[in-house]
Curated annotation (Swiss-Prot):
Species whose genome carries this gene: Caenorhabditis elegans
Family (UniProt): Belongs to the SURF6 family.
Stretches with biased composition (Basic and acidic residues): 107-132, 151-160, 212-221, 286-305, 427-443
Pfam entry (one): SURF6
Localization (cell): Nucleus, Nucleoplasm
Region (Disordered): 53-73, 89-232, 249-350, 414-472
Biased composition, class Low complexity, residue ranges: 95-106
GO MF: DNA binding; RNA binding
Protein name: SURF6 homolog gldi-11
Compositional bias of kind Polar residues: 197-210
Length: 472
């Protein structure tokens, strides 16, 4: 008996596995899970993804990136078996039955209502054809009039149906427009079917009269702790859509920003006139002040000229002690004047800069000699002196100064300097010799030319005399 029972159980297990493998071939969307299961799966995925991310990452990441992350973490069930296993574990969805998808059937009453609406719209359009308003404005006005004519109960029903339609249509769209709701997931479990879903808690349009109230409601929902949930995000998206529609209606009706009336235009013109008059008055005042200043300066000049002619000191001089062309200088005592402050011996010893290499070598040798003399008397004092000198030199170098205390380099520099001096001297002598030689050659040439000219004149005269027969 036990063997037969085990064989039956094995056969049942094999059959179950085969059935599950066949079930897994059916897509999750086509299986027929009800909307509660789909919504809870979606909520589970969102909550698990949000747990993995920080607040900043949630805001910065797009819906597509979040979907990729969910797939990477294995939060999206790909087969029917995975969904069934999850549902068997959860308390809410322990009893699972596939749901048949039924196409929505239009009621005759609804059809009649729609026909009546169409007839009314056509009549009103024909009546308003003479007006210059566009067809879009006419249709929007007709809809508003119909809403006012209908009873309150019908109006409420319409609002509920429109809210449901907006939820189903715009539930995934506002992510693209406003970035508030998550985009529709590519996974089959996240795709919403045409079956009626649970109505979300939305704010009625009647309560939101102005855009300010809509903004307040959006702010309230965003400040809520559970603002990451899809329901609240849908509500925010709907509110934003309402606000946008209201703004579009206002623009179409022409109730935009307030236009400038004739009274306002007059007021603005008056203000401009007053400003212009004020600026003119200020300009006149400034010119008058400048004129007064010039007159006062001329008067002072006149008084100074008169006082100098009479030999009296001018008023200005008495006040400040300065006249325009006479300045008084305070002469210091002869002791202080021309007396220069001598630099200390220590500072002079440290001043090892410049190109006077001879004096620099002398300074370095002198300091070395003094240190050697001190070392003979007190070696400790000599070491202290050396350390002090080293520190002072290093500090000077750190400050950007130069300390030329290397004897070998100084001697080389001196030799180089002397060589340069000799070279320049030689160069100058050569230049002088050359100029002297050129000068002498030019002078000799000039003398030669002059002598030649004199000789030519003499020859010409002698030839003339010879021709005349005066000279044999």
């Amino acid at each position: 008996m036990a063997e037969t029972l085990e064989a039956v159980e094995d056969a049942v297990d094999i059959l179950e596995k085969e059935m599950l493998s066949f079930c897994n071939l059916i897509p999750v969307n086509s299986w027929g899970f009800d909307d509660d299961v789909k919504e809870s799966l979606k909520m589970r995925k969102h909550s698990l993804v949000n747990r993995q991310l920080s607040k900043k990452e949630r805001k910065s990441m797009s819906a597509q990136q979040k979907q990729h992350l969910a797939k990477g973490l294995g939060l999206v069930p790909n087969t029917v078996q995975e969904v069934l296993e999850w549902m068997s574990k959860s308390k809410q969805h322990s009893k699972v039955q596939p749901q048949k998808v039924v196409a929505p059937v239009k009621r005759p009453a609804d059809q009649n209502k729609n026909k009546e609406k169409v007839v009314k719209k056509d009549q009103k359009k024909q009546d308003k054809k003479a007006d210059s308003d566009s067809e879009e404005d006419d249709s929007s006005d007709d809809e508003e009039k119909e809403e006012t004519d209908e009873p309150v109960a019908k109006k409420q029903k319409k609002e509920e149906s429109s809210d449901d339609d907006e939820d189903s249509e715009d539930g995934e769209e506002p992510e693209g427009n406003n970035g508030a709701v998550e985009a529709e997931d590519s996974d089959s479990t996240d795709e919403e079917e045409e079956t009626p879903s649970k109505p979300n808690k939305t704010v009625a349009q009647s309560t939101l009269k102005s855009n300010g109230k809509i903004d307040k409601e959006i702010q309230k929902l965003e400040d809520d702790e559970d603002n990451e949930s899809p329901e609240i995000r849908r509500q925010i998206a709907l509110l934003r859509l309402q606000k946008k529609l209201k703004e579009m209606k206002v623009e179409r009706k022409g109730k935009g920003p307030a236009k400038v009336t004739s009274a306002m235009a007059e007021k603005m013109a008056e203000e401009k006139r007053l400003k212009r008059r004020e600026s003119k008055l200020k300009l006149k005042q400034r010119r008058a002040e400048e004129k007064k200043g010039k007159e006062a300066a001329a008067q002072v000049k006149k008084e100074t000229v008169e006082s100098t002619e009479n030999g009296n000191e001018p008023v200005e001089k008495q006040k400040s002690g300065i006249s325009f062309n006479n300045l008084k200088f305070e002469i210091k005592e002869d002791k202080q004047r021309g007396k220069k402050q001598r630099t200390a011996k220590k500072d002079r010893a440290l001043k090892l800069t410049g190109r006077d290499y001879k004096s620099l070598i002398a300074k370095v040798e002198e300091t070395k000699a003094t240190i050697a003399k001190v070392r003979e008397a007190d070696p400790h004092k000599a070491t202290i002196m050396e350390d002090e000198l080293k520190w002072e030199k290093t500090l000077k170098r750190a400050a950007g100064g130069k300390v030329k205390d290397n004897l070998g380099m100084l001697k080389k520099a001196l030799v180089k300097k002397n060589k340069m001096k000799d070279r320049r001297k030689q160069k100058w002598e050569n230049r002088e010799n050359k100029t002297e030689g050129e000068k002498q050659t030019k002078q000799d040439k000039r003398k030669k030319n002059l002598q030649k000219r004199i000789d030519d004149v003499k020859k010409r005269k002698m030839n003339k005399l010879r021709n005349k027969g005066r000279i044999l």
